[in-house]
Amino acid sequence: GKYMYHADHIAVGQVFLDMYQKYHDRNMWLPTLARTEFVINHPSASTLELDYRNMASLERWSWCDALFMAPPVYAKMYMLTDDWKYIEFMNREYKATYDYLFDKEEKLFYRDHRYFNQKEANGTKVFWGRGNGWVLGGLCEILQTLPRNNMHRQFYQDLFITLSDRIIQLQGKDGYWHASLLDPDSYPSPETSATGFIVYALSYGVNEGLLDKATFMPAIEKGWKALVKAVEKNGKLGYVQPIGADPKKVTREMTEVYGVGAFLLAGNQIYKMAK
């Protein structure tokens, strides 16, 4: 179909591959196997210049959210099959997106190429909170999949540490990370999907010994307490920016499933930390 290559539509493969590892039912992984085989055997010739009017531009990881959605699937397929084609494809495509969207001065990811020359109200570059949260979350999934002695792991581990070191500097005094990482004054409301993914990543990093506990624990504790404050008595998580691509205003009434997912990922790491 027209979404055969689309990262958002392969992300569910992560869950099915995890289920296959638990239940050993081949029916759980065959659709993901077929899809990844097709993508690798028929690589897209598209550029990384995202254009929603051109579906071909969505065939590659041309927006930073995609680095959460698709690469972990290929990492898991590599570990399940021991077939190098999966890790070679992931490395090639991930590094192409990194080279294109990662700003080496700010050490943050642009959401996509449309933001290269845009500026926030305060004159800074546009770096989206949730977008960088997606990247950090995806790196966690890759690092949890590739063993520490795997030759392909170092690039992702180094990037995880670099991005974590930068992101900790951008936490608000209220404990949240905001929709705009460099212009929080223009978007002062909490944003819990970005905060959830970031707390998840930083907690994972500390738990795995990748990040210095003394340096990162204060930010983790502030971030987790902030997330808990955003939960209503009925369990609803508020302040989740709706589906989008750049910083927007957020209200307490706003919620989305990916925000809850990020909260649960963070909570899982906090629980491990407390045990």
What are these regions (language model features)?
Residues 58, 72-84, 91-92, 96-100, ...:
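Active-site lining segments of carbohydrate-active enzymes
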Residues 1-7, 13, 19-30, 42, ...:
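CBM-like carbohydrate-recognition segments
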Residues 13, 67-80, 136-143:
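Alpha-helical scaffold elements that line and support the substrate/ligand-binding pocket
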Residues 1-2, 30-50, 84-110, 157-175, ...:
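Long, well-ordered core segments of solenoidal/helical folds
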Residues 19-37, 77-91, 143-162, 168, ...:
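Structural helix-adjacent loops and short alpha-helical linkers that scaffold large soluble proteins
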Residues 41-76:
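Flexible, glycine-rich active-site loops centered on histidine and acidic residues
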Residues 1-11, 53-67, 118-137, 148, ...:
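Solvent-exposed loop and edge beta-strand segments that line ligand/cofactor-binding
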Residues 10-19, 57, 72, 115:
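Structured, active/binding-site neighborhoods that engage oxygen-rich ligands
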